[in-house]
Amino acid sequence: MFKRALALFAAGLMAACSTWGWAQVKEIPWGTSAVGSSGHKALIVLAELLNREMPKYRITVQPTPGAIVSVKGYATGQFEGYYGADIAFYELANDTNRFKGFKASMKRQPVQSFWVFTVEVGSAIHARDQGKLKNWRDLSGKAVFTGPLPWDVRAHLERAYGALGVKHQYRQVDLSAAGSLLQGGGIDSFIVYTNAEATTAPWITEASLAADWAALNPSADEVAALKKAGFAVTEVKPDVFKRDVHTDKVILLPFYYGFHVGLEVPEDDVYRMLTLIEKNVAALTQADAGFAQIAKDMPGFQRKGVASSVDFVPIHPGLAKYMREKGVWDAKWDARVAKK
């Protein structure tokens, strides 16, 4: 009888310990962009690493129609992590465009905690139009597909056009039809972009089969105006597009994407997350080339990402701790570190 009671007590104790251990695991439903997107693919790779190395957390990847849906989802309590870009943070802070009127619905403030890669946007025209469309301002009055309405790439290019005073006519088209519409004259231009200055989107590759498009670079004066307006500018090699783009360089405007969590994840845990990512970045890059930029210089990339958004959203204290340790922190950002 005593042995039976002892066995039951031991079994109960084990069950209680198991239940206690289970309760210590914090669920992180992490919003990202749609299945098949670079953001969805990258988060799957990242979540696998973090779930293995940080067992107190359980990350589940939650695809959404677009990255801004994940930002809004975090702010309203639907997600604990999100896929956020500097252009989205700009719109949120300024109560404009896709975030117009959204602040009234917010339950918590998004913060920046990890920057992962850039996306670089620009413009393309048909090669036959190179003689008459020579810079971005020449697109005024023209029919332009700058991307699907909710997408960050569209928002960034539209913002750049606005800074230059480009009064184009936006055309919403199916991605699969963009090339044929450009070829047939249904549109005069469409957006082109790269990811981490290394690859392009499948739909742009498909459009290349239907239309002989040429990269349309902003003029030197336009580049100067864009820089003055706060845009970063980069030159990408044409061979990224794996076709003749009829220019010897492609001038694009990068913006920064990150996988972010809020203050619900403590400073020390975000710091550990960042150090784990840095330690395992070679394996991450092998699984997804989108991590190549942080493989080259993770601390420097965090500095650039923070600089892109420091005026729009606060900085997670765990990211600040990591950056201070790596010597890439700017003391003028001290007041922008998030506090509960």
What are these regions (language model features)?
Residues 8-17:
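Bacterial N-terminal signal peptides
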Residues 134-135, 141-159, 230-299:
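Ligand-binding clefts/hinges and TM-proximal coupling segments of bilobed small-molecule sensing domains
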Residues 42-76, 245-247, 340:
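Extracytoplasmic small-molecule ligand-binding "clamshell" domains
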Residues 177, 194-215, 225-227, 268-340:
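An extracytoplasmic/periplasmic, membrane-proximal ligand-sensing/linker region
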Residues 86-87, 95-105, 112, 127-129, ...:
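Pocket-lining segment of extracytoplasmic ligand-binding domains
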Residues 17-23:
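Sec/Tat signal peptide C-region and signal peptidase I cleavage site
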Residues 25-53, 57-60, 121-184, 195, ...:
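Bilobed "Venus flytrap"/periplasmic-binding protein-like clamshell domains
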